[in-house]
Amino acid sequence: LPHLIKSIKAQGYHTAFYYGGEIDFANFRAYFNQGGADKIISKLDFDFSSSNTKWGIHDDIVFDTLFNDLNKETTPFFYTLFTLSSHEPFDIPIEPIFGSENNENSFKSAMHYTDACLGKFIEQAKKTTWWDSTLVVITADHGTTQINNTSNGQKETFHIPLIWLGGALAITDTIISSVSCQLDLAPTLL
């Protein structure tokens, strides 16, 4: 069967998946093994004392690990990181900036934390030798019902970001407003 990881590896890229949680969640292990990922990092690869949330390892630790590993990489790479701190119950290792008295504020605080972790990673990456030849793709696995009390049936809960950035982009500061879905990502990358 076609597989994004197989296609990327065939072009000479080193592939890896980083997730601070249980690797069998959502069948991640099977998916990345089927694709032949060169490296799979999960909560089992971190010191047990770092696992201080229901889901596993907080995003800042996983982003730092990814950044350190990328700095050792000598071949073209296709690395994926799946965050977890922005998922319920929204456990974060910092003071909740929006409070935590209800799910909406807890969600916003968790998103602020994850955004800060991502922002730090991007700012560090911009100072590396590999940034100019790197494409960073940011998207989500699903939307949320935590904001404005939407329900799973409302279209707003299906809106997710798709952001492309990096030194490898020839065109920047472009907004494309046409509708697409996660299924469009692999053919666009290839």
Language-model regions, residue ranges each:
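Solvent-exposed soluble domains appended to multi-pass membrane proteins
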Residues: 1-190
